[in-house]
């Protein structure tokens, strides 16, 4: 399980250094093989260990190519999916087209989200967090049953 938000830097070649606390887990569970794709709802990237991505990849063909929304999801997720292998120094090369999509330049937030990571431009990440907190403070609607069961 991946959790927490960590500031990492992209080098001049577009590589990010995976924090040490995740490297062993990624090597053990995925042999350092990762898949990166776009998030279809936010200006960030999704970074999956290969076994986690394969679960999603098995579900994508079940979507109907005749349904425009389902076909769009297939096209966006699979069409942007790019494999990346962690090198001996614990770095991952993020494809240029993906970096451009998320506006990633130098300072990147690596955000653990259970079975995957999100990659955000640092400034965009902080703006998103502020928007999310502001939205929660203004929310007056009823909580879903799942949120009601989540006691913090």
Curated annotation (Swiss-Prot):
Encoding gene (name): mraZ
Pfam families: MraZ
HAMAP family: MraZ
Gene3D superfamilies: Transcriptional regulator MraZ domain
Keyword Repressor: yes
UniProt keywords, alphabetically: Cytoplasm, DNA-binding, Repeat, Repressor, Transcription, Transcription regulation
InterPro entries: MraZ, MraZ_C, MraZ_dom, MraZ_N, MraZ_sf, SpoVT-AbrB_dom, SpoVT-AbrB_sf
Top-level taxon: Bacteria
GO cellular component terms listed in the entry, alphabetical order: cytoplasm; nucleoid
Keyword check for Nucleotide-binding: no
Entry's Gene Ontology BP terms: negative regulation of DNA-templated transcription initiation
Sample GO molecular function, one term: DNA-binding transcription factor activity
Subcellular location: Cytoplasm, Nucleoid
Protein name, entry field: Transcriptional regulator MraZ
Oligomeric form and interacting partners: Forms oligomers.
PANTHER family linked: TRANSCRIPTIONAL REGULATOR MRAZ
Annotated ranges, domain SpoVT-AbrB: 5-52, 81-124
Family: Belongs to the MraZ family.
High-level lineage: Bacteria, Pseudomonadati, Pseudomonadota, Gammaproteobacteria, Enterobacterales
Function: Negatively regulates its own expression and that of the subsequent genes in the proximal part of the division and cell wall (dcw) gene cluster. Acts by binding directly to DNA. May also regulate the expression of genes outside the dcw cluster.
Main location: cytoplasm
């Amino acid at each position: 399980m991946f959790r927490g938000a960590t500031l990492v830097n992209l080098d001049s070649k577009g590589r990010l250094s995976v924090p040490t606390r995740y490297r062993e887990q990624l090597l053990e569970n995925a042999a350092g093989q990762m898949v990166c794709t776009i998030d279809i709802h936010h200006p960030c990237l999704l970074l999956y260990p290969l076994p986690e991505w394969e679960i999603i990849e098995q579900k994508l063909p079940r979507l109907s190519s005749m349904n425009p929304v389902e076909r769009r999801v297939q096209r966006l997720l699979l069409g942007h999916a790019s494999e990346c292998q962690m090198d001996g120094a614990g770095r991952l090369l993020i494809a240029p087209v993906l970096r451009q999509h998320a506006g990633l330049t130098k300072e990147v937030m690596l955000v653990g989200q259970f079975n995957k990571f999100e990659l955000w431009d640092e400034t965009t990440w902080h703006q998103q967090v502020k928007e999310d907190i502001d939205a929660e403070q203004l929310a007056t609607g009823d909580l879903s049953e799942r949120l009601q069961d989540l006691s913090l």
